[in-house]
């Protein structure tokens, strides 16, 4: 059986290091003798149920570690279930029982170090490149046992569409990018051209060929296929590493890029500049025959550079961008790749690119900023030195990214440990049941304190295009190292809330100097328009988005402001100002005023706010209403709040809930789920947004209806059902936050019970 380990290293691994004793680290190991026959049967049954229902509920319920934790803690639900009939009203007693049942269950899922483990995955292009990298470097068998391979294949089979393809993410339609990547992954893992469960390979290849073959794969796919040797580098648009030696004032200098974009194209430019191609094995030669409509040797690579399947095209490239790529391809690249320029410029650029890669690797303990970047940086280190320590350090951190659930093994974005725990702590504190869960609160408080970043990136970080990080919180754990504004805001807010409670219940409070550091981070990330960026200060011109090199995502070139980050910062700084009125008060007051104005300006015509990190307008509106309320705005004096309330009330379904399609994110208009389908997480968001607006004083009936749906959705165990994925990024890709189904319904019930008058 597979088992989740918490906060552990890799034994005496000399290539693994940490800043805080691995707090928050999550790794899976397989025990061939583990589990009783009954426990093994329960895992088999969970897998069967998921597979049988995979086209209806595409996100896993994240059951494997949950069953493990509940078993280890001998969990038993002792609080009787409650249901509210159509003719009945929600009472204080009913709400309290449902809340306590949910908290009792959720508390049993807390890890020993204080965080809540959870899947944070869903994109179907995360895992295959890792398999490609290990295949190229010859470490596939060393890293992936037969059990790993079995579970990776299970995941691929579970998320194959009925038409034979794979979507960009688990909820989406089939795309050339992910169908090709997952097909090649199956072949590398030993499946024949027509093998795999239910003829998975044959069906996938049929989809690929019927949609034009892999010449229509998007640019990221062209890059990975070129690295594998299944494509030719001359069929890709240039990614010259010489950009790294441009003067910093140059408009398209990498320093002006969004951090994730910069960190993707850093190793890509190195591999492109090297024209690196992995070993041409018999499998690679066979794939060249399987994936094209014409013989490989007859393909005109120059003409396929701009091809992209319509199923993959979310951001059609403007003409100006194609002119840029053509100019680089025809005029610049032939010179840069030949003597003397390859010695004068290219070699220097490649060395500088590797310097940046090593710097980023070291400052993230070889986790890197995310899974896409992790694999590319790892491969670049191997290309530089196959036997070097840099590559070995990367190998030691692969297990941090792997996650197991009933749908198989997948690769995480990089873990949401701090993010989920910050939300969870706010939900539990809102319950006003602190005396019943003091141990849970104390552990969570300790984890949050331990996860705060204690230093800036090493050395002259500004020359490496990095921002301050001292005092920040990351999305995952401290070792990751990358500051995020809303994670910092939630970490700060939690510490402030804990400081208002007795230390004998929640433990000692965080040092005020550490809180001052986090305030400094937040103040540094506000833009001139009042909005809050996520990772680094904004400043690059908006027109650079015209050069977005991906066809699948939007707004990836430069850093942007986000309503959710802005709201989170307002909430944290408003509370900080109350508790520490003498620290940078003038700056904080001005910050909140400008941030509230930004939120008002970002409201759409229908009264909603676009959600950048959750689906979608329901999520964004919850955050915006919470932020405006924290800034002191009310329904009576703020038109934006009134319009936001009107939007939420109009979107409420007859059953009392809310249900929004992930298509809202890409279409940028509100699209309800078909029929009377409500999502319990989105219902919780809407309920909390309305409560923040003061709806209880005006008309509590919509709140009662929403609470009734949440209460009646609760399962016998105190858990809530897994429904559609509710996270998103880059406008076009969903992300599954498996802990959301517990955190947000509990948070909403806690707010409802505390702030709405009940009989």
Swiss-Prot record:
InterPro entries: SQ_cyclase_C, SQ_cyclase_N, Squalene_cyclase, Terpene_synthase_CS, Terpenoid_cyclase/PrenylTrfase. It is an enzyme of class 5 (isomerase). Saccharomyces cerevisiae expressing Glycyrrhiza uralensis CYP88D6 and CYP72A154, combined with the expression of Arabidopsis thaliana beta-amyrin synthase (beta-AS) and NADPH-cytochrome P450 reductase 1 (ATR1), accumulates glycyrrhetinic acid (GA) and, to lower levels, beta-amyrin; these GA production was increased in the presence of G.uralensis cytochrome b5 (CYB5). One of its GO terms (biological process) is triterpenoid biosynthetic process. PFTB repeats lie at residues 149-190, 592-632, 641-682. Its EC number is 5.4.99.39. The active site is at 486 (proton donor). One of its GO terms (molecular function) is beta-amyrin synthase activity. Keywords: Isomerase, Repeat. One of its GO terms (cellular component) is lipid droplet. Transmembrane segments: none annotated. SUPFAM superfamilies: Terpenoid cyclases/Protein prenyltransferases (SSF48239). It holds the Pfam family SQHop_cyclase_C. Gene3D superfamilies: 1.50.10.20. It comes from the Eukaryota. It catalyses: (S)-2,3-epoxysqualene = beta-amyrin. Signal peptide: none annotated. Belongs to the terpene cyclase/mutase family. Converts oxidosqualene to beta-amyrin. PANTHER family: BETA-AMYRIN SYNTHASE-RELATED, TERPENE CYCLASE/MUTASE FAMILY MEMBER. This is Beta-amyrin synthase. It comes from Arabidopsis thaliana (Mouse-ear cress).
């Amino acid at each position: 059986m597979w088992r989740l380990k918490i906060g552990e290293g890799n034994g005496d691994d000399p290539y693994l290091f940490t800043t805080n004793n691995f707090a928050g680290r999550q790794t899976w190991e397989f025990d061939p003798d583990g589990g009783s026959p009954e426990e093994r049967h329960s895992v088999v049954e969970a897998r069967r149920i998921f597979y049988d229902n995979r086209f209806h509920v595409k996100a896993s319920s994240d059951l494997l570690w949950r069953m493990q934790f509940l078993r280890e803690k001998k969990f038993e639900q002792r609080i009787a279930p409650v249901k509210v009939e159509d003719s009945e009203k929600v009472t204080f007693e009913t709400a309290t029982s449902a809340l306590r049942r949910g908290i009792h269950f959720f508390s049993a899922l807390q890890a020993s170090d204080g965080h809540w483990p959870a899947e944070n995955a869903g994109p179907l292009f995360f895992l295959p490149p890792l398999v490609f990298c290990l295949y190229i470097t010859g470490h596939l068998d060393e890293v992936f046992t037969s059990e790993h391979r079995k579970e990776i294949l299970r995941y691929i089979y579970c998320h194959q569409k009925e038409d034979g393809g794979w979507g960009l993410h688990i909820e989406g339609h089939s795309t050339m990018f992910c169908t090709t990547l997952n097909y090649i992954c199956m072949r590398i893992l030993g499946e024949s051209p027509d093998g795999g469960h239910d003829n998975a390979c044959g069906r996938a290849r049929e989809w690929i060929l019927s949609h034009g073959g892999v010449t229509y794969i998007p640019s990221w796919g062209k890059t990975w296929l070129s690295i594998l040797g299944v494509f030719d580098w001359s069929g890709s648009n240039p990614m010259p590493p010489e950009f790294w030696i441009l003067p910093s004032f140059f408009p398209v200098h990498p320093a002006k890029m969004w951090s994730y974009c910069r960190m993707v194209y850093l190793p890509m430019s190195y591999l492109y500049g090297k024209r690196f191609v992995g070993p041409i094995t018999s499998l690679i030669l066979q794939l060249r025959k399987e994936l094209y409509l014409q013989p490989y040797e007859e393909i005109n690579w120059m003409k396929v550079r701009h091809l992209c399947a319509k199923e993959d095209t979310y951001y059609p490239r403007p003409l100006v961008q194609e002119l840029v790529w053509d100019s680089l391809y025809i005029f610049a690249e032939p010179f840069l790749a030949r003597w003397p320029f390859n010695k004068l410029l290219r070699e220097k650029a490649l060395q500088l690119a590797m310097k940046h890669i090593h710097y980023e690797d070291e400052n993230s303990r070889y986790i890197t900023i995310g899974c896409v970047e992790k694999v590319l940086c790892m491969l670049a280190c191997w290309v530089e030195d196959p036997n070097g320590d840099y590559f070995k350090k990367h190998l030691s951190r692969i297990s941090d990214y792997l996650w197991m659930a009933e749908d198989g093994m997948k690769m995480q974005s990089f873990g949401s440990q701090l993010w989920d725990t910050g939300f969870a702590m706010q939900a539990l504190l809102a319950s006003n049941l602190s005396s019943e869960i003091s141990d849970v609160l104390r552990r969570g408080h300790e984890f949050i304190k331990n996860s705060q970043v204690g230093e800036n990136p090493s050395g002259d970080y500004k020359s490496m295009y990095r921002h301050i990080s001292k005092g920040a919180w990351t999305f995952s754990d401290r070792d990751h190292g990358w500051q995020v504004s809303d994670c910092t805001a939630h970490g700060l807010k939690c510490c402030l809330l804990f400081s208002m409670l007795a230390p004998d219940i929640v433990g000692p409070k965080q040092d005020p100097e550490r809180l001052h550091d986090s305030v400094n981070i937040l103040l540094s990330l506000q833009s001139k328009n009042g909005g809050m960026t996520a990772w680094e200060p904004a400043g690059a011109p908006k027109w650079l988005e015209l050069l977005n090199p991906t066809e699948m995502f939007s707004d990836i070139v430069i850093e942007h402001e986000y309503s959710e980050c802005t709201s989170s910062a307002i909430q944290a700084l408003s509370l900080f100002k109350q508790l520490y009125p003498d620290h940078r008060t003038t700056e904080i007051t001005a910050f909140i005023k400008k941030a509230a104005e930004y939120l008002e300006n970002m409201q759409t015509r229908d009264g909603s706010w676009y959600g950048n990190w959750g689906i979608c307008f329901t999520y964004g509106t919850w955050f915006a209403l919470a932020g405006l309320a924290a800034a002191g705005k009310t329904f009576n004096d703020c038109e934006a709040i009134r319009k936001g309330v009107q939007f939420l009330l109009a979107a409420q379904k007859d059953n009392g809930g809310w249900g929004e399609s992930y298509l809202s994110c890409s279409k940028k208009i509100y699209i309800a789920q078909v029929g009377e389908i409500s999502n319990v997480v989105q219902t919780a968001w809407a309920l909390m947004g309305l409560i923040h607006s003061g709806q209880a004083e005006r008309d509590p009936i919509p709140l009662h209806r929403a609470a009734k749906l949440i209460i009646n959705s609760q399962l016998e165990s105190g858990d809530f059902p897994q429904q559609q994925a509710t996270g998103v990024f880059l406008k076009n890709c969903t992300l599954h936050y498996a802990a959301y189904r517990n955190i947000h319904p509990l948070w909403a019930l806690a707010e409802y019970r505390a702030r709405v008058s009940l009989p």
